[in-house]
UniProtKB/Swiss-Prot annotation:
It catalyses: S-adenosyl-L-methionine + a thiopurine = S-adenosyl-L-homocysteine + a thiopurine S-methylether. Its EC number is 2.1.1.67. The keyword Glycosyltransferase does not apply. One of its GO terms (cellular component) is cytoplasm. S-adenosyl-L-methionine binds at residues 10, 45, 66, 123. The gene is tpm. This is Thiopurine S-methyltransferase.
Length: 219
């Protein structure tokens, strides 16, 4: 996935990946992480996800990163927020209370920014990236998070030869290989969701599972 592909999808309204509700799996599994109140939570490729509003409501400082300025502006407009805006080397920052979105490239985040994150939530980032970029993403983003940073990762597992991504299939073997050496990725839930995703069925996908991981950055 290149930047233009992602930006075009937002401009053209091809954003079926956007959910109009908070992700139930986030609500179910996040509390057990015990991320401290006031801790900063990274949400990469954030779009305009309502999950960020929910995380902020848990007393956390949310740091979303999103390439599309349109998505960032829609997030604040649709949630009735008027952000303060400033620029840095990392991108254009939109800040309202404990919600901050950086309109920019997640790979441009500085070491200090990532090291300061106490939590991370990834529902739509890893699965949006093609294989070579997934390796870079895991290494350069997760590999720079601070020791003890905890989070939730949600992926999809389906026969990749039956459908072109994104979203891409990222099975357990790949997750373990991507995070080996710097992050513990423990599979805590797996469920068949094919009957809830008709677009996959229509494209000939015979099996579709969602996988949920508890992440913890190793020292």
């Amino acid at each position: 996935m290149d930047a233009d592909f992602w930006l075009d999808r937002w401009r053209e309204g091809r954003t079926h990946f956007h959910q109009t509700r908070v992700t139930p799996l986030l609500q179910k599994y996040w509390p057990a992480l015990d991320v401290p109140a006031g801790g900063q939570v990274l949400v990469p490729l954030a779009g305009k996800s309502l999950d960020m509003v929910w995380l902020a409501g848990q007393g956390l400082r949310v740091l979303g990163v999103e390439l599309s300025q349109l998505a960032v502006e829609q997030f604040f407009d649709e949630n009735g927020l008027r952000p303060e805006i400033h620029q840095s080397a990392q991108g254009r920052h939109y800040v309202a209370g404990n919600l901050e979105l950086i309109c920019g490239d997640v790979f441009a985040l500085e070491d200090a920014t990532l090291a300061a994150c106490a939590g991370v939530y990834d529902r739509a980032a890893l699965v949006a990236l093609p294989e070579p970029m997934r390796k870079r993403y895991a290494r350069e983003v997760y590999g720079r998070l601070g020791r003890g940073c905890r989070g939730i990762l949600i992926t999809l597992d389906y026969p990749q030869d039956q459908m072109e991504g994104p979203p891409f299939s990222v099975d357990d073997a790949e997750v373990q290989a991507l995070y080996a050496g710097h992050t513990e990725a423990r599979l805590i839930d797996r469920r068949d969701i094919l009957d809830k995703e008709p677009k996959f069925n229509q494209r000939g996908v015979a099996r579709l599972d969602t996988l949920v991981y508890r992440l913890e950055r190793l020292g």
